[in-house]
């Protein structure tokens, strides 16, 4: 779980009504305090990237919380989570697009400065072909991201459209 080592309050999505169908119904979001009996932090997990925030194991053994620790209406947790999904996916797309742009900019600097056979790598025709292709893909990505952001700001971005933004990037 992200920031598990530092969290004072943990949001747990769990099934609180096992009789209701379909399965996504009956899921609630429960707040669990880090000092609650039965809760224990585990180890930090090794990850590839995104090291600014830890990712930790968490253990819950017979943890009991009062009904007042239910965030929102009982059984509506999945609906709450899904209502935020487009924004979450859009955030991932923004991060990917900006990282791609930075990588492209760094590559352009490198091929301008790096010399091979007495001339900059930028002067080779194939390098220019590849950079032109990458720049075009970046431009399409920015245009798509602008479109998705505009829809999000109007509260019109659907989960499917947000998935497309994430997929592209």
Residue ranges and their predicted role:
Residues 35-66:
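Flexible, small-/acidic-enriched active-site or ligand-binding loops
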Residues 9-13, 29-31, 55-62, 70:
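Conserved hydrophobic/aromatic beta-strand scaffold that supports enzyme active sites
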Residues 21, 68-74:
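Cytochrome P450 core scaffold surrounding the K-helix E-X-X-R motif
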Residues 1-41:
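A short core secondary-structure module
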Residues 13, 44, 85-88:
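A short beta-sheet element
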